[in-house]
């Protein structure tokens, strides 16, 4: 048991390091641009920051959604221990993405911010996805699970429309080459399709077991 706990801690440490590496690299490159005027972030540093943080938010969202199918396929219940961590990192990257847009792109002009959210559909769906992530991040603790009971599971089903909104945000944002958003849309479709299939299979199994036995001829 102790050896298993140590291996889980080591795995979590590795996941923390892997997930924080992109933001650490981005921070280092931003510092180079800010202090030295380098081109580490390309010709448009703000757009690059927004793109990378948004992309990692979407990737981590899909990885979080993949935890349950992976557990069901492999039988490794320990994978569930990583789901909350990855979900919170999804919210972190999404929040950095939104902050970069508000403060680096729009420079905190609130009137323009509200106009952009209302007028541009891809911003509307992206902002909506972030808003829906907020209650999931707040209620991700064991304490909230106990308080909300069954409603906790119902609330956290918001992750599915959030995934759809996030992919739609990326799809609408891309102007020409849609191969990358199409790839993420395909992954999301597989993950959601798996859940639908498992639920239908469970219902069929339950119906089969609850059906009365056939009458024996007399």
Swiss-Prot record:
It is found in: Cell inner membrane. It comes from Xanthomonas campestris pv. campestris (strain B100). Pfam families: Ferric_reduct (PF01794). GO terms for biological process: protein repair. Belongs to the MsrQ family. Its main location: membrane. It is a multi-pass membrane protein. Part of the MsrPQ system that repairs oxidized periplasmic proteins containing methionine sulfoxide residues (Met-O), using respiratory chain electrons. Thus protects these proteins from oxidative-stress damage caused by reactive species of oxygen and chlorine generated by the host defense mechanisms. MsrPQ is essential for the maintenance of envelope integrity under bleach stress, rescuing a wide series of structurally unrelated periplasmic proteins from methionine oxidation. GO terms for cellular component: plasma membrane. The lineage of its organism: Bacteria, Pseudomonadati, Pseudomonadota, Gammaproteobacteria, Lysobacterales. Signal peptide: none annotated. The chain crosses the membrane at residues 14-34, 60-80, 86-106, 121-141, 155-175. This is Protein-methionine-sulfoxide reductase heme-binding subunit MsrQ.
